[in-house]
Amino acid sequence: LSNMGVVKNAVSGFLGVGDKTYTNAKGKSEFMSTAGLKAADVKSASYTLSGGKYTYTLVLNNGSSYADSANKKNNSPVDRSGILVGTGDKSAFDHKCAANLYTAINNTDGASVKSVRESSSNVKCVAVVNASNGRLERLTVSFDFAVTLTNTKYVVTIKNAGGSASTSVKYSGFKF
């Protein structure tokens, strides 16, 4: 059981727990993708104008994802907000769906997991736009998430393990 801290640290890393800063060169957007939100993903939307800046706020519906060896399902609006980039596990992902976690854990040094369930809630996207030139100045996506791992193996077998966290992803310093 002395290795349990290693398991916790590895899983926390896969989940994106912790502080990370990435810098893109002008004209690059490796850590953002095109948003694909649908009207049904949005719980509420509002905007304000103050000090020459528009602040747009979208509150998204809760979502979930699931992965095992045969199935990968994802109905998580946060993943359609533009912060889930690519497939597989990469530390640049700001939110990891169950499929990302399943692949990452099963490709880690001697570790395996039978299935992964992930859920997100309290998702809020806030964009600040300069009213005079229409340029995006700041984007923040905040959400709570919880993960349950079934039959996780790493030195020992853990029938069920889980955790939850709150996070905020902040983008700023856009270059045009």
Residues covered by each model-derived region:
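Subset-of-secretome marker
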Residues: 1-176
